Amino acid sequence: MDNKVSASPRGSYRKFLEHLSGAGKAIGVLTSGGDAQGMNAAVRAVVRMGIYVGAKVYFIYEGYQGMVDGGSNIVEANWESVSSILQVGGTIIGSARSKAFRTREGRLKAACNLIHRGITNLCVIGGSGSLTGANIFRMEWSGLLEELAQDGKIDNEAVQKYAYLNVVGMVGSIDNDFCGTDMTIGTDSACHRIIEVIDAIMTTAQSHQRTFVLEVMGRHCGYLALVSALACGADWVFLPESPPEEGWEEQMCVKLSENRAQKKRLNIIIVAEGAIDTLNRPITSEKIKELVVTQLGYDTRVTILGHVQRGGTPSAFDRILASRMGVEAVLALLEATPETPACVVSLSGNHAVRLPLVECVQMTQEVQKAMDERRFKDAVQLRGRSFENNLNTYKRLAIKLPDDKIQKSNCNVAVINVGAPAAGMNAAVRSAVRVGIADGHKMFAVYDGFDGFAKGQIKEIRWGDVGGWTGQGGSILGTKRILPGKYLEEIATQIRTHNINAILIIGGFEAYLGLLELSAAREKHEEFCVPMVMVPATVSNNVPGSDFSIGADTALNTITDTCDRIKQSASGTKRRVFIIETMGGYCGYLANMGGLAAGADAAYIFEEPFDIRDLQSNVEHLTEKMKTTIQRGLVLRNESCSENYTTDFIYQLYSEEGRGVFDCRKNVLGHMQQGGAPSPFDRNFGTKISARAMQWITTKLKESPGKGKRFVSDDSICVLGISKRNVLFQPVAELKNETDFEHRIPKEQWWLKLRPLMKILAKYKTSYDVSDSGQLVPVRHRGGPEEPAAI
């Protein structure tokens, strides 16, 4: 294999995909165990990436059972075999739990079937059981080959030629129960299904003043129950990893009746299917219902969500995750040597990593062992930083301490929304208000952005005022794009009048510019010498200092859903190309990631300049595509990608150049991208990042015991962002150099590295820098104290 590298300007070496060849290799791809949404996206990525590098790729139908049975269950795939499957839930190649593969005879048959097709590279998409099976198969491989040779089923030449089996795993499981991975394929989509059901149930529960007990899947892992409880603001949640303390029955009934007393018309209780008490006895949804009915007399209903959670369309997150994992899996197989251990490709923050399969499985089994031995604190820690943080955040927001038990700080904190509306803003406000109150502050809501601030539209906001805000789209406080520059005097007066000691700004690029203006005004107005922090919230995802913004995931899902419908329309019409315009200002995040999630043929963005030759090349590419069985095209265009190559221009060009081959339609998605109920990701991201911002404010205010302290240092006016896996508070003054103010985007954007991935999956030859790939990372049990906790 010609694995060349080239020297980069920094002196390190860079590795490019075009230097990796799969010629002469055969890859088998199978899905095993329970199905999960997004598996098809992973299969598609493996097949297309495999073909792209010159390897043969085989579908192994019906999981390990198909491998044992052989025959028509192992079929060579081509480019078109995986067309139109991105948006389909489940797995098109079937999945089964195989008893035969658990026996040596079964594995012997499987090895024979693979050898006859020259397959020595396996890509397994499944849970921990499926991946463990693959590793056992790999360990036994040479012994199986020798046995087959002795039985005369293969010759000695084949034993030499196919001496090693390479195995790469991708975790496809809605439970998110695999240690070492931030998110498994299917988890985000399962959260979507749960939240869709909860949102629907809330309307009927409010109408009748009912209590609903919802049972969610996850076997012995409480991840789905926990994140859905956080995303809907459930009254109580039962998890296997963190059982309720003795006397929980009475505590729960008190909590439910308190909420009813505060005019809350419904109660939601979420139960993980593996929920237990501290003595490892099961807690069932029926038992909880009986308790509520007998103790409180509430009209109570049980809803068991069941296999609804496995079904439906994969979310944008799962499609992108699975596509990235599929490509990374093929790279791992190409680079594998006989000494390379079986690995799992996974996501850490927004980075693809490879982890040793055996270590991950052992650690996953340790969680179950800890639960069996009733070491529940250890079980929560072994689940990872993210799980622990989710649990702590849920507890802080769900349970209000009595007023006499909260130590008052005598500080007033203002919360304000700035910029365009973004789904998840309200979840962020709710979280900030409740964490602030729990920390002893008085919380003030500022209505209608800086405009409202100047006019004195400021009101104290209490714990109960923000109940039910998590699932609301848009901005309840109201938000405007107006900057504070021309209202500095008035805003300073309002800060003085209401004695504001700190400000939390939730918004987009305008909020960032506003923060810079307030920072510059500190010299003239001492009122602005208070801690200020901004939480990024914009569909455009263009705020410097953060890889993600609240609202971008919801917008991405809206774009993906719309593209799915449009593709279906184009499939029915045949020979039709759709040009779709997305929002984002000059930032191409939505167009690029939407293109990856929807399976677009091209995506035009400002960050990658294009000319008429590129447009011509795309038209020719689509003309060739129309000669195949896939007679439709999808092209995304960011609204500000080019001053002259407008959506109308591109539409007219495609219409003229494609005359006689395909016809063309255009669709401007517009403000629908800002609306709708927030996705589970945006609800929880908003909740957690806002809680972290309030913790920072509390810490800063504690630095100033006297009333007179003025905050003038740069580190007292920050943007809170996520970079890779870390939560960073970055002074706005430092972020200036990282910002392209003319185009309102950061100078460096992480997602541009994924740009070639979309092109490869759309059958374009391109250069792809894979320098970040290839490191086998050890599985960490816990992050050290110096490592910032994951959001």
UniProtKB/Swiss-Prot annotation:
Stretch list, region N-terminal catalytic PFK domain 1: 1-399
Cofactor(s) the protein requires to work: Mg(2+)
Modified residues (N-acetylmethionine): M1
Modified sites of kind Phosphoserine: S6, S12, S21, S142, S386
Pathway this chain belongs to: Carbohydrate degradation; glycolysis; D-glyceraldehyde 3-phosphate and glycerone phosphate from D-glucose: step 3/4
Description of how activity is regulated: Allosterically activated by ADP, AMP, or fructose 2,6-bisphosphate, and allosterically inhibited by ATP or citrate.
Catalytic reaction(s) noted: beta-D-fructose 6-phosphate + ATP = beta-D-fructose 1,6-bisphosphate + ADP + H(+)
Record PTM text: GlcNAcylation decreases enzyme activity.
Binding site for beta-D-fructose 2,6-bisphosphate: 481, 538-542, 576, 583-585, 639, 665, 671-674, 744
Residue positions binding substrate: S173, I174, D175, R210, M217, G218, R219, E273, R301, H307, V308, Q309, R310
Post-translational modification Phosphotyrosine, affected residues: Y651
Known EC number: 2.7.1.11
Residues at the catalytic site: D175
Annotated transmembrane regions: none
The protein's assembly and partners: Homo- and heterotetramers. Phosphofructokinase (PFK) enzyme functions as a tetramer composed of different combinations of 3 types of subunits, called PFKM (M), PFKL (L) and PFKP (P). The composition of the PFK tetramer differs according to the tissue type it is present in. The kinetic and regulatory properties of the tetrameric enzyme are dependent on the subunit composition, hence can vary across tissues. Interacts with ATG4B; promoting phosphorylation of ATG4B.
Chain's role: Catalyzes the phosphorylation of D-fructose 6-phosphate to fructose 1,6-bisphosphate by ATP, the first committing step of glycolysis.
Protein name per UniProt: ATP-dependent 6-phosphofructokinase, platelet type
Organism the protein comes from: Oryctolagus cuniculus
Annotated gene: PFKP
